[in-house]
């Protein structure tokens, strides 16, 4: 039976589900190869866990990620969390886990902060409309 690892990552309203399996080092986000993923900032952010884990680990894996919701940066952060969790679960290596945690804790832990809702009496969550006394 083929070993397949499913992992997930979240950031704001973006949710990413990664499938890690034995392969040739292909990484796809929504069926698009990582090399062709735009914008470049998001591609670089997603490739961080791959660079930290090392080429010897990643070259033997195929990673397919399905990401929904949120914006570009939120999706990129959700994908990198899902990929990092999948690599850690696949390798069962504490040194890789420690390297991820030392680099950025959000590689392993989802960032659950949400946008604060707008309230009445103002243009946003905290600010109020200007008050006039005369």
From Swiss-Prot:
Query: Which UniProt keyword terms apply here?
Result: Ribonucleoprotein, Ribosomal protein
Gene3D superfamilies given in the database record? 3.30.230.10
Which region ranges are annotated with the description Disordered? 114-134
Alphabetical GO CC annotations of the entry are: cytosolic small ribosomal subunit
Q: Which superkingdom, per the lineage?
A: Archaea
Q: Which GO terms describe its biological process?
A: maturation of SSU-rRNA from tricistronic rRNA transcript (SSU-rRNA, 5.8S rRNA, LSU-rRNA); translation
> Does this entry carry the keyword Ribosomal protein?
yes
What are the GO MF terms of this UniProt record? Answer: RNA binding; structural constituent of ribosome
> Pfam families given for it?
Ribosomal_S9
Entry annotated with the keyword Ribonucleoprotein: yes
Q: Name the family the entry cites.
A: Belongs to the universal ribosomal protein uS9 family.
Q: What is this protein called?
A: Small ribosomal subunit protein uS9
């Amino acid at each position: 039976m083929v070993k397949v690892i499913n992992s997930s990552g979240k950031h704001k309203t973006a949710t990413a589900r990664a499938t890690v399996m034995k392969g040739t080092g292909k990484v796809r986000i929504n069926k698009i190869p990582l090399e062709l993923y735009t914008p470049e900032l998001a591609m670089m952010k997603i490739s961080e866990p791959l660079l930290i884990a090392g080429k010897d680990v990643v070259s033997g894996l195929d990673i397919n990620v399905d990401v929904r919701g949120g914006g570009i940066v939120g999706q990129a952060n959700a994908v990198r969390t899902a990929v990092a969790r999948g690599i850690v679960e696949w390798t069962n290596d504490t040194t890789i886990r420690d390297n991820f945690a030392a680099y950025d804790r959000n590689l392993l832990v989802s960032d659950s902060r949400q946008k604060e809702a707008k309230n009445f009496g103002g243009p946003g969550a905290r600010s109020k409309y200007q008050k006039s006394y005369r």
